[in-house]
Amino acid sequence: WRFFYNKQTDDYFTEAAEEDLYYLYDSDHVDIPAGLGDTQVPTFPYRYGRFRSSGNHFVKMKESTSVSNTTRYNGYGQSTCLAANHGVGFAAQAGAFSEYTFEKMGDPQPCYTDELFIEEAEAYFVAKVEAMIASGLEIGKEFTAVDVAQPDSSDFCKCKNCMNAIAAERANSAPVLYFTNIMADVMAEKFPGLWVSMLAYWGTSDPPKKTVPRDNVNVSYCFYNDINKLVCGNHSLNGEECSRHAVDGWGTTNYTYAEEFKEWCRISKRVTVWYYPLNWDFKSLTFSTIKTLRDDFKFFSEYGVHGFWICCADPSPWNDGKRESIDILAMYIIQRLLWNADMTDEEYRGMIDDYMYVLYGESGKLIYDYYEWIAASEADGCWPVMACYRSPAGAMNIEKTRDDFELCISMFEDAIKYAPSAKAEYAVRLASCAMYTRGLFASYYDRYLNGSETQKARYTEIWTYFRDLAVDTQYYFAGGYGASVGELKLSDFNIEENPGEMLARLSDSQSVVSEWWKWWEK
């Protein structure tokens, strides 16, 4: 498929049960001359990411669902998710350990220096690999790694042995790395060619000073929210634009992450990346997630990253037809950068323009203009990528968002006029919901609470339109609520309520900053 795409057509194709989910440019004839051939080497060997095919039916990824699930197309081997995704936690839930259990996120970690735990872990993972081989799977093809990664928790053992290991390596990752190396030695002896995967994540992202991972260890480094530091959502993960030392109380700077990551790359034979910098909580207050993508993946390419697990919370199957946002475009760009992180400026912009045209026709240019405006309306400096770790208002330029609200509305009104079909028009209106949420939030204090009669009337007009649109489309207004279960109702809306407060009220996650929607009091 990629051969035909690159050499013959600009067609988009997504295999689906219904015929209307195909998108192909009109073509009466495609000439395929004899002897045509092509060889390409992707930037990253492993390219299978979470949400590789969007659940949103307006989105047409340039790949077929049928091939996205094959190991050969995405680089031989299990997905990064399976290769380093809290394997010890799953082993505990399977009853592998006599004295350790892990039932939910946040439960205590095991003692990684405990001899009984190590013995039982070895028995469990060896048996797991033996069972896979017995079923006919081949190391290096159907599977390449065994997942011995830590459970999803920041509550680590503080026994004498673990603390001694931490002191010796001057790194919290020491006990986990020691355990991983033991498992790696076992696997190297019994199953040559098999990788052993660990996480550098949520308490273990700091590399050790002395001990290095065995040659068959894959380190999955997570650009995430750690115990004492947070990823900056405003700058590239290369850390070059962030301050060396965080200026907020959360430790927000990509400089620290970049330095840790580069050291893991230096001491490890293979590094994969968990990529988190996309919209998460309070998703209706959408922030730009495309402005740093190119720099991020060039950075990863320079340091020889093997592959990725893309972790984002917006373009998900359960949002099907209920949310259009910048993250959908971001996911597509990521898929293309995984194949070629070195495309030219012309190629990069052409790729985006082409994709936006497929989604929205001529309207796509206006929607992309809005996406670029989002980046220009964000606050300066470093701020956390996930809203639950910050004040969403603190990452916005409130004044610019408020003052440009009418401009943004006009972008979408024009986009509706140019929509080539009823489906595209619906998609444009759905995409406008996040714009209205952002603009109403920024305008509430100055235009409604303290505005003139004319300003209040205009705010009321816009708010009423948005309310009706959100209910009519069952817009996925907040995580865990709204479109996914069809619960968004007219009674959920109250014009006297700050739109940010409504978003927080309907969300299943909350910010660590209380009453962040009262930005004028902060």
Question: Across the structure, where does each feature detected by a protein language model lie?
Answer:
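Acidic, His- and aromatic-enriched active-site or binding-groove loops in soluble protein domains
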Residues: 166-186, 214-233, 300, 333-343
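Catalytic domains of carbohydrate-active enzymes that cleave complex glycans
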Residues: 332-522
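Structured mid-domain segments that build the active-site/substrate or prosthetic-cofactor binding neighborhood
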Residues: 109-119, 126-127, 134, 240-365, ...
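Structural preference for beta-strand elements that scaffold enzyme active sites
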Residues: 48, 143-147, 195-197, 216-220, ...
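Substrate-binding cleft/loops of secretory-pathway carbohydrate-active enzymes
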Residues: 197-231, 284-291, 317-329, 434-436
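Feature activates predominantly on carbohydrate-active enzymes
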Residues: 1-178, 188, 262-286
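Conserved radical SAM core fold
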Residues: 107, 153-155, 222-246, 278-280
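Aromatic-lined carbohydrate-recognition surfaces of secreted/lumenal glycan-active proteins
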Residues: 180-206, 271-280, 308-313
